[in-house]
């Protein structure tokens, strides 16, 4: 499993004292309130700079962060388009049968008769339930509702998901 998780993306500065505006990449933006520090980088690597978090505010759909050592707008500007990254061990504990999206991406998806449907490439948040985007071997996209009645098994050891598709969800050409 992935060692680091992206929990936000810095999209702009906020004010003149070095604060940044971040889009939360988590279902629970309040999780930022408990963070003491985070990595800030354009990509996950072994050499990501680590910043102490001085303050956290919530404004509309954004999180306003103040990092130690980032004290003016020019310094904050350099963090635009960077991700706020945490260690997996610092992540919130998920309820049973709930998964981090990054752990599902790349998973092989099969129907209950062991026919491979494709590879999970994305997860769409629709409000009522998530939808898994599965790309078949012939490049067709299958949209699968992330419901307990549909998703029968998720096995990270085998990198495999088994789904029981509702009648008519896909055509026979997949």
From Swiss-Prot:
Residues 96-169 form the PRC barrel domain. Keywords: Chaperone, Cytoplasm, Ribosome biogenesis, rRNA processing. Pfam families: PRC_RimM, RimM. One of its GO terms (biological process) is ribosomal small subunit biogenesis. GO terms for molecular function: ribosome binding. Its main location: cytoplasm. It is found in: Cytoplasm. GO terms for cellular component: cytoplasm; ribosome. The PRC barrel domain binds ribosomal protein uS19. Belongs to the RimM family. An accessory protein needed during the final step in the assembly of 30S ribosomal subunit, possibly for assembly of the head region. Essential for efficient processing of 16S rRNA. May be needed both before and after RbfA during the maturation of 16S rRNA. It has affinity for free ribosomal 30S subunits but not for 70S ribosomes. Binds ribosomal protein uS19. This is Ribosome maturation factor RimM.
């Amino acid at each position: 499993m992935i060692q680091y998780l992206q929990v936000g993306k810095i999209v702009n500065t906020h004010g003149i004292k070095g604060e940044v505006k971040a889009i939360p990449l988590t279902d629970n933006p309040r999780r930022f309130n408990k963070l003491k520090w985070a990595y800030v980088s354009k990509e996950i690597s072994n050499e990501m700079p680590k910043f102490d978090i001085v303050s956290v505010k919530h404004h509309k759909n954004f999180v306003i962060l103040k990092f130690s050592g980032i004290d003016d707008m020019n310094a904050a500007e350099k963090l635009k388009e960077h991700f706020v990254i945490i260690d997996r061990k610092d992540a919130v504990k998920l309820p049973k049968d709930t998964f981090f999206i990054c752990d599902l991406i790349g998973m092989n998806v099969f129907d209950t008769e062991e026919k491979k449907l494709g590879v999970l490439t994305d997860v769409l948040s629709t409000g009522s339930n998530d939808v898994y985007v599965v790309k078949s071997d012939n490049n067709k996209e299958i949209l699968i509702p992330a419901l307990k009645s549909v998703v029968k098994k998720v096995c990270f050891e085998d990198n495999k998901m088994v789904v029981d598709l509702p009648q008519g969800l896909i055509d026979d050409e997949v």
